[in-house]
A protein has these predicted regions:
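Short, conserved phosphate-binding/catalytic loop or strand-edge motifs used
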Residues: 140-157, 190-197
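Juxtamembrane "anchor/assembly" segments of surface/extracellular structural proteins
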Residues: 1-58, 90, 95-103, 121
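Solvent-exposed coil/turn segments that connect beta secondary-structure elements
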Residues: 46, 83-85, 97-101, 204, ...
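Internal metal/ion-chelating core segments
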Residues: 160-217, 222
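Surface-exposed cap/loop segments at beta↔alpha junctions
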Residues: 54-150
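Acidic, small/polar-enriched beta strand-loop surface segments
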Residues: 2-9, 171, 175, 203-253
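Short amphipathic beta-strand and strand-loop transition segments with alternating hydrophobic
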Residues: 25-31, 81-85, 183-188
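Amphipathic, non-transmembrane alpha-helical segments in extracytoplasmic/periplasmic proteins
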Residues: 22, 34-35, 40-41, 96, ...
C-alpha cells in the first residue's frame, strides 16, 4: 500500500517566503468553492527545538500562512488566524482558513463603479484593488486554470462609505442569477518551484458535468474501497406538524 506523506510549509504572509516546516499532528482541513475552507493542527512543543524550527515566528496569527503538501503536490493553503498554547500538554494548536479568508478582512474603501462589465472582470478587479492597498499584496495571482470572461455583463456600484469587505463583494456577485464559481488554488510554480496561489473563476460552474459515459467521473467505494468511513446525520429538531404565518395585522377597535 502506497504511503502518503504530508508536509506543512509555513510562510510569511506578505513575501510568501518559506520560514519553517513543522511536524504537525491531528491535522484536519477542508476545501470549499465560493468561501474559505478551514484548517486545524497541533504541534507538540516538548518534542522539538522551538528555536531551531522557528516555531514562534512562523506561526504568528494574521502574519503567517501555511501550505499543505501531499506527496509533492500542494493541496491546501491559507492564513493562520489563531494559535493556542496549552502548558499542561505542551501543545500548540493552530487554526487557519483558506487564502480567500484574507479578503474578508479587506475593504472596498473607495467609490468603485462598473457599467456593463463582465462579472468575472469585476471579481478580478476587486481582488486586484484590495492587493493594491499599502501592505495589502499577499501575492495572489489570477486565473492559472479558470476563465477570464463569462459573457455575463452587469452593473455594480460599491460606495467607499459602506466599507464592504472584498470577499462578500465577490461572493454576492457570484450568487446572482447566471453567476460563477471562484476559489484560490495553490500549486508549485513550474519555473521557481515555490508555492503560489491564484484566484480562479469558473463559468458557469467549476468541474465537469456528470455523464454516465465519462470514464473520469469519481467513483466512491465503501467498504474496502477509497472511502474509509462516512456519517449519515438525521435531525428531527426541525420537523413541524403545523406551519404558522404572521402578517402585519391591523389596529384593534
Amino acid at each position: 500500500m502506497a504511503v502518503t506523506n504530508y508536509r506543512y510549509l509555513f510562510v510569511d504572509l506578505l513575501t510568501n517566503t518559506i520560514i519553517a516546516e513543522l511536524p504537525l499532528t491531528g491535522v484536519g482541513f477542508t476545501q470549499q468553492l465560493n468561501q474559505p475552507g478551514n484548517f486545524q493542527g497541533h504541534l507538540l512543543i516538548s518534542g522539538i527545538n522551538t528555536a531551531q524550527f522557528n516555531v514562534d515566528a512562523s506561526t504568528i496569527p494574521g502574519k503567517c500562512g501555511l501550505y499543505v503538501d501531499r506527496n509533492g503536490i500542494l493541496v491546501w493553503g491559507g492564513v493562520i488566524w489563531g494559535r493556542t498554547y496549552n502548558s499542561q500538554s505542551q501543545e500548540l494548536s493552530l487554526t487557519a482558513q483558506e487564502w480567500m479568508s484574507y479578503f474578508a478582512h479587506r475593504r472596498v474603501n473607495e467609490d468603485t463603479s462598473f457599467s456593463n462589465i463582465d462579472q468575472l472582470v469585476i471579481a478580478k478587479t476587486l481582488i486586484e484593488n484590495a492587493q493594491a492597498q499599502p501592505y495589502g499584496d499577499i501575492g495572489v495571482g489570477y486565473n492559472s486554470h479558470g476563465q477570464t470572461t463569462s459573457g455575463v455583463l452587469v452593473d455594480r456600484v460599491y460606495y467607499g462609505y459602506e466599507l464592504k469587505n472584498v470577499f462578500e463583494a465577490v461572493q454576492d456577485l457570484s450568487r446572482q442569477d447566471d453567476g460563477f464559481d471562484f476559489v484560490i488554488d495553490v500549486s508549485y510554480d513550474l519555473i521557481t518551484g515555490l508555492p503560489r496561489k491564484d484566484f480562479n473563476t469558473y463559468y458557469p460552474r467549476s468541474g465537469v458535468a456528470y455523464t454516465t459515459t465519462n470514464i473520469n467521473i469519481p467513483v466512491f467505494e465503501f467498504p474496502a474501497g477509497n472511502m474509509v468511513e462516512y456519517e449519515y446525520p438525521e435531525d428531527g429538531s426541525l420537523v413541524a406538524n403545523t406551519m404558522y404565518t404572521l402578517g402585519a395585522g391591523s389596529n384593534e377597535g
